[in-house]
């Protein structure tokens, strides 16, 4: 961790030093910078060629011969042949190279797949995420018939749970309660859409199965959350990082 911090400090110092040197370099001048304009354009107060605001002989508004408004021959308003209002051939007002416009950027399938693999928030579920697949636990329900029924039908029950980040809950019970409700609701709706219905026994067993998986999901997410906070605290409390932050503040303020 210390070596990484020193490398980060060296990288930022080199970067900001280069930026400071770039700011002090004089700006390169272009051709004819600060002088007169391109030959033939003239200065704002000088003469221009050809004269502005008028045309040649027989051109009251700057068009060619017989062109009262600046169009081609037989074009009263500046369009092409057969174009009364300035469009391209066969176009009533647009430009003539519509097909030369750049194509709209397409969404990369690689980006979409990457977002899905990263566990993005499930659309339409108000910020819920879908956990990774789990093995369904072996449960006992107090009698042989229910135990046998569970073993025969356990593959019909969820093996993934929906949940929100653990920092949105005060304790494990609230997390598990919310996790069980949304998971069973989503699973039953999806399965019913496929033409399969659940009995009261199925719902009872699903509640037990999903509860166990939600507890496991909470423990996993809590551990990851606290590990992340501890790592951040250790990183930002190390002397090299504190020195780096102080140096950046000095550069920004100064």
Swiss-Prot record:
Signal peptide region: 1-22
Bilayer topology annotation: Lipid-anchor; GPI-anchor
InterPro entries recorded: Prion (IPR000817), Prion/Doppel_b-ribbon_dom_sf (IPR036924), Prion/Doppel_prot_b-ribbon_dom (IPR022416), Prion_copper_b_octapeptide (IPR020949), Prion_N (IPR025860)
Residues involved in Cu(2+) 1 binding: 61-63
Sequence repeats: 51-59, 60-67, 68-75, 76-83, 84-91
Region feature (Interaction with GRB2, ERI3 and SYN1): 23-231
Chain residues in the propeptide: 232-254
Residues covered by region (Disordered): 25-108
Carbohydrate attachment residues: 181, 197
Gene3D superfamilies registered for this protein in UniProt: Prion/Doppel protein, beta-ribbon domain
Recorded GO CC terms: Golgi apparatus; plasma membrane; side of membrane
The entry's keywords: Amyloid, Cell membrane, Copper, Disulfide bond, Glycoprotein, Golgi apparatus, GPI-anchor, Lipoprotein, Membrane, Metal-binding, Prion, Repeat, Signal, Zinc
Binding site for Cu(2+) 4: 85-87
Residues noted as binding Cu(2+) 2 in the record, renumbered to the chain: 69-71
GO molecular function: copper ion binding
Entry annotated with the keyword Disulfide bond: yes
Binding residues for Cu(2+) 3: 77-79
Illness: PrP is found in high quantity in the brain of humans and animals infected with the degenerative neurological diseases kuru, Creutzfeldt-Jakob disease (CJD), Gerstmann-Straussler syndrome (GSS), scrapie, bovine spongiform encephalopathy (BSE), transmissible mink encephalopathy (TME), etc.
Subunit structure and binding partners: Monomer and homodimer. Has a tendency to aggregate into amyloid fibrils containing a cross-beta spine, formed by a steric zipper of superposed beta-strands. Soluble oligomers may represent an intermediate stage on the path to fibril formation. Copper binding may promote oligomerization. Interacts with GRB2, APP, ERI3/PRNPIP and SYN1. Mislocalized cytosolically exposed PrP interacts with MGRN1; this interaction alters MGRN1 subcellular location and causes lysosomal enlargement. Interacts with KIAA1191.
Family under the similarity heading: Belongs to the prion family.
PANTHER family associated with the record: DOPPEL PRION, MAJOR PRION PROTEIN
Identification of the protein by name: Major prion protein
Species this protein is from: Nothocricetulus migratorius (Gray dwarf hamster)
